[in-house]
Regions:
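A short, well-structured edge-of-sheet supersecondary motif
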Residues: 10-40, 72
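Conserved small/polar residues in nucleotide/adenosyl-binding loops
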Residues: 225-229
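Catalytic-site signature segments of enzymes, centered on catalytic residues
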Residues: 42, 110-188, 210, 215-219
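Active-site SXXK
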Residues: 29, 47-72, 100, 151-155
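Acidic, glycine-rich loop-and-strand cores that form catalytic or ligand-binding grooves
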Residues: 230-236
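Active-site helix/loop module of the DD-peptidase/beta-lactamase fold
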Residues: 66-105, 157-210
Length: 236
């Protein structure tokens, strides 16, 4: 490897990116580079933000494989029989799991949506209420935080288990990964501290006990590499 380029990379990380704790680089399955930064080490667990969505997608795949979900093109509304559709929202009745996973669904976001989301007790219902009526199904619209929780709701309703327990049995434990706790916040300060921490191990849940699907999971650099390797094995 080009040592000059490596030194430049490390200098940039050490001076500009205090949220990076580790990098592992592989080529043909062989580790070519591994280093840790900003007080991190091989066991440091940090909030992986939107990587959580990829983990949820893997869990949806496992649920499909095990027969909990029949097919990826099922309508999401079918998994929430008690949800009351508001204002004759036709779009929400057409949206599928595939649409959710590919982020090609319309949302009715407003400026204060995030404050209301974080202070609401039921993130799944909150997300369902924002679906449809604005935009078109099939057009990409990135969902930073609000929305993916619907997939968590589907996993809970189909498996009869928490996302945390389902993931622990079928993904984390088989790979030797330990996600310890279900995390809740009692204040904004606690949430901000979580986003910056390098030693918190767990997965955020709402007041209903549903794991966040668009954010909220912590993993170590090694754990992410392990999941990456297993995913590639299944693809090829």
């Amino acid at each position: 490897m080009n040592q000059e380029k490596i030194m430049q990379l490390e200098e940039i990380i050490n001076t500009k990116y205090d949220n990076i704790t580790g990098i592992i680089g592989l080529k043909n399955g062989v580790t070519k580079y591994e280093n840790y930064f900003n007080g991190g080490n091989v066991n440091s667990t940090v909030h992986v933000a939107s990587v959580t969505k990829s983990i949820i997608s893997i869990l949806i795949g496992i649920a499909l494989d095990k027969g909990y979900i029949e097919k990826i093109d099922q309508k999401i509304i079918d998994f929430f029989p008690n949800y009351v559709i508001k204002n004759n929202n036709l779009a929400i009745q057409k949206i599928t799991i595939r649409d959710m996973m590919t982020m090609t669904v319309p949302y009715k976001y407003q400026e204060d949506s995030y404050i209301k989301y974080f202070t609401s007790k039921d993130w799944v219902t909150f997300s369902l209420n924002l679906l449809g009526d604005c935009g078109e199904i099939g057009k990409f619209q990135y969902a930073p935080l609000i929305g993916p929780d619907i997939l968590s709701g589907i996993l809970v309703n189909t498996t009869g288990r928490s996302v945390f327990d389902f993931a622990t049995e079928y993904l984390f434990t088989p790979l030797g990964i330990e996600v310890k706790d279900k995390i809740t916040f009692s204040s904004e300060e606690e949430q901000v501290a979580f986003l910056k921490a390098k030693d918190i191990n767990g997965w955020v849940i709402d007041s209903c006990g549903i794991n966040a699907a668009g954010w909220g999971l912590t993993l170590s650099t090694g754990a992410k590499m392990c999941i990456r390797d297993r995913s590639i094995q299944h693809i090829y």
